[in-house]
């Protein structure tokens, strides 16, 4: 959740397992358009195709769509240019899920403050990510390419 990409920086395998690393939050807390790329996934099926959300948006590095299924992404094209912002080929993943060996891994950049955690949609998303990680629900994590 949120700050997990900042943990265990001296342990490369942790970053590999998680699927990415923290690389700044150039806009700090801002309202952004979020694209739901996985309306069929248990943790994101309750979100509309595109919705606005306010949070501190973490930028990732060492992330590859070849290894993870992006569930939610920020539409960075709708934001003003910002120093330090460098989406990966225009892509700004926020929530993803993947397999790591026989384990299920999910990450979300959402959840900076209590207001976000008090949001019922975010609570449902995290509950469903946990249930999926435990194998209690099924969800396709086949990687998909970035589509603008």
Sequence positions of predicted segments:
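Catalytic beta-strand/loop cores that center a nucleophilic Ser/Cys/Thr
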Residues: 20-101
């Amino acid at each position: 959740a949120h700050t997990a990409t900042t943990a265990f920086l001296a342990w490369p395998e942790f970053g590999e397992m998680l699927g990415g690393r923290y690389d700044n939050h150039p806009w700090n807390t801002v309202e952004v358009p979020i694209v739901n790329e996985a309306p069929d996934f248990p943790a994101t099926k309750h979100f509309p195709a595109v919705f606005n959300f306010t949070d501190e948006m973490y930028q990732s590095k060492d992330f590859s769509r070849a290894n993870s299924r992006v569930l939610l992404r920020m539409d960075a094209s709708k934001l003003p240019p910002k120093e330090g912002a460098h989406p990966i080929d225009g892509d700004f993943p926020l929530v993803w899920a993947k397999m790591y060996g026989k384990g299920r891994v999910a990450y979300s950049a959402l959840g900076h403050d209590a207001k976000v955690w008090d949001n019922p949609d975010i609570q449902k998303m995290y509950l469903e990510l946990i249930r999926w990680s435990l194998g209690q629900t099924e969800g396709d994590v086949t990687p998909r390419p970035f589509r603008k």
